[in-house]
């Protein structure tokens, strides 16, 4: 999997840029931008690799001798390193604009190695800087740019924007029997819109979203003039696939077993988002239908869902009322799923290194 990178400007972004001569050439001119250290630490924790890229006009010439550049730069690096911030590379263009070099931002010579196929995750990599040239560099690299402003898009806001997850997936499934659109937002809650044509099934799916703490929109057109089999089965397959896609690389997610009593029912669920589909199911019903949903399709729903979601699922309910027994299964699954998809860190919860 390709890597996420942040290409970060120095003067005016990591450290303050002197407004008079725009050169940090003395120790007393060195000042970090507010909140840059906690922001960079948070971004590193979110698996971004850091690259510093800076234009230093005339560096090494009489107008900006190397010996005046080095002390504040080295102190800055010592401070950042001491706080656990590590830059993969420090890329410096020492030329003046009139030199017409190929490495001065917004030109891309300094970052050519990152533009090779498979090196950089271009969707989730950014240039961060305080000047228009930084945004132009981002455009030339084919990635997004963020314009840093101390009183606008500051480091706290940048860190929040780049680390706040919004896991989403869309699945369109069309067969001879059904046409299904599923949108899943694992980090949003409320506002789910569900219409399968089977009213009680809609109510059960809403239990998953409500108790799972996420939003899903499901629109189904199926062959209900025959029965509810294809509608329930294909919805489960599309929903399971959407959840699996939205989980992404699964870093930081938890695994959880949950017990939910409901009136006279006791439902148990254990869920492992393991990459290995399996269902253990135990539930008995007195009647063939609850509302307009076939009770035999409840097991089939969870079997299809666990297959498409690539999870190991144990479900069991006991009680007297069929409505409550069915509802308890969907609720307990939702509550367990809430725990399993919640992001609690950044490590992959597997000794195998893959889920």
Curated annotation (Swiss-Prot):
Output the GO biological process annotations, alphabetical, semicolon-separated. L-histidine biosynthetic process
Q: What is this protein called?
A: Histidine biosynthesis bifunctional protein HisB
Give me the reactions it catalyses. D-erythro-1-(imidazol-4-yl)glycerol 3-phosphate = 3-(imidazol-4-yl)-2-oxopropyl phosphate + H2O; L-histidinol phosphate + H2O = L-histidinol + phosphate
Stored CDD domains: HAD_HisB-N, IGPD
Annotated region Imidazoleglycerol-phosphate dehydratase: the residues are 167-355
Tell me the GO molecular function terms.
histidinol-phosphatase activity; imidazoleglycerol-phosphate dehydratase activity; metal ion binding
User: Which cell locations does it reside in?
Assistant: Cytoplasm
Organism, as annotated:
Yersinia pestis
């Amino acid at each position: 999997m390709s890597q996420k990178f942040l290409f970060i400007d120095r003067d005016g972004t990591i450290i303050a840029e002197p407004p008079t001569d725009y050169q940090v050439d003395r120790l007393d001119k060195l000042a970090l931008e507010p909140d840059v250290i906690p922001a960079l630490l948070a971004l590193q924790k979110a698996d971004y690799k850091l690259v510093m890229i800076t234009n230093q006009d005339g560096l090494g010439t009489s107008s900006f001798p190397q010996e005046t550049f080095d002390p504040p730069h080295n102190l800055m690096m010592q401070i950042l390193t001491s706080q656990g911030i590590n830059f993969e590379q420090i890329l410096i263009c020492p030329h003046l604009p009139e030199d017409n070099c190929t490495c001065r931002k917004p030109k891309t010579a300094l970052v050519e190695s990152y533009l090779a196929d498979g090196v950089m995750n271009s969707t989730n990599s950014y240039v961060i800087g305080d000047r228009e040239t930084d945004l132009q560099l981002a455009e030339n690299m084919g990635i997004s740019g963020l314009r840093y402003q101390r009183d606008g898009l500051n480091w706290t806001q940048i860190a929040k924007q780049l680390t706040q997850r919004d896991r989403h997936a869309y699945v369109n499934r069309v067969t001879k029997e059904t046409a299904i659109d599923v949108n899943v937002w694992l980090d949003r809650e409320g506002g789910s819109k569900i219409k399968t044509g089977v009213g009680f099934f809609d109510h059960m799916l809403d239990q998953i979203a409500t108790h799972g703490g996420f939003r899903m929109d499901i629109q189904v057109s199926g062959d209900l003039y025959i029965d509810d089999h294809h509608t329930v089965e294909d919805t489960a397959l599309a929903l399971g696939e959407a959840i699996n896609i939205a989980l992404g690389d699964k870093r930081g997610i938890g695994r959880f077993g949950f017990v939910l009593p409901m009136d006279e029912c006791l439902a148990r669920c254990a869920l492992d988002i393991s990459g290995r589909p399996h269902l253990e199911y135990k539930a008995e019903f007195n009647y063939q239908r609850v509302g307009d949903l076939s009770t035999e399709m409840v097991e089939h729903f969870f079997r299809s869902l666990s297959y498409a979601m690539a999870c190991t699922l144990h479900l069991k309910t006991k009680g007297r009322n069929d409505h409550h027994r069915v509802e308890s299964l969907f609720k307990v699954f939702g509550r367990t799923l809430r725990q399993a998809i919640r992001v609690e860190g950044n490590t992959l919860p597997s000794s195998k290194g893959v889920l």
